[in-house]
Regions:
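Noncatalytic, typically N-terminal accessory segments of nucleic acid-processing enzymes
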Residues: 1-135, 140-141
Length: 141
């Protein structure tokens, strides 16, 4: 009798685990996926690492001045930085949220590329894919 009781408990446990698994799978399948971020129609890309060097040493003042002028023209700046931007400005890595705070833009409008990624390629792809203009001193080829 004890062996039957142990077997029933084992079966009940397996059924319980299977039930939990099915519920989790169904719950995951029914979740609504967020829509991909869209680029605003009035967007313009700013080569942040390039612009902050206008006039010599890296400067947030120069960059924010350019960004303010862009927003005064009712354009939405999308700023792309090299991964080394934080080291150049603050001596340490800065992610997109930190850069957004420093320059006063929404984090969704800032992109710090990963180490080893060429920011210019990201800028050109973004511009070409979305028909956007770029603010930079670089000669993209």
């Amino acid at each position: 009798m004890e062996q039957i009781s142990d077997t029933l408990l084992l079966i009940a446990g397996v059924i319980g685990l299977a039930f939990v698994y099915v519920v989790l799978v169904l719950r995951t399948r029914n979740q609504v996926q967020p829509e991909a971020a869209t680029v605003p129609p009035n967007a313009i890309i700013v080569d942040g690492s390039n612009v902050m060097h206008w006039g010599g040493d890296p400067s947030l003042q120069v960059l924010t001045g350019v960004i303010n002028r862009i927003t005064d023209l009712d354009l939405t700046p999308i700023v792309v930085f090299d991964s080394s931007v934080g080291y150049r400005l603050m001596g340490r890595y800065l992610h997109g949220n930190a850069m957004a705070t420093l320059i006063g833009l929404p984090a969704a409008h800032i992109y710090v590329v990963h180490k080893g990624v060429v920011a210019d390629e990201v800028i050109l792809d973004l511009a070409q894919d979305n028909g956007l203009k770029v603010v930079s001193n670089d000669r993209f080829r």
